[in-house]
Amino acid sequence: MATFDDFMKLDIRVGTITDARVFAKARKPAYQLQVDFGGELGVKRSSAQITEQYKPEELIGKQVLAVVNFPPRQIADFMSEVLVLGTYSEGGVVLIRPDKDVKNGDKLG
């Protein structure tokens, strides 16, 4: 069982998607995302399996939550630096987003 201390080790931040493209070399359908987390963290890259619910052009400008302190993960020829968070639903993964615009880099609290 996970503890509250385990949860507190995660650094979950808000970022804005600035680029989204089809990740043709991924084994499962995915997009390559660039997410801007503001001054402290800057722009990070992520591979996200969210193709069932979103088109790449719909993602630009959306704020999302992501874990920013996992080690980078090589996926095909792409280095994924953050884990964008979503919920599994019948129609595919749905992104977890703030319900109001907030500053990029804000921490989940």
Question: Where are the model-predicted features located?
Answer:
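Phosphate-backbone binding interfaces of nucleic-acid-interacting proteins
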Residues: M1-G109
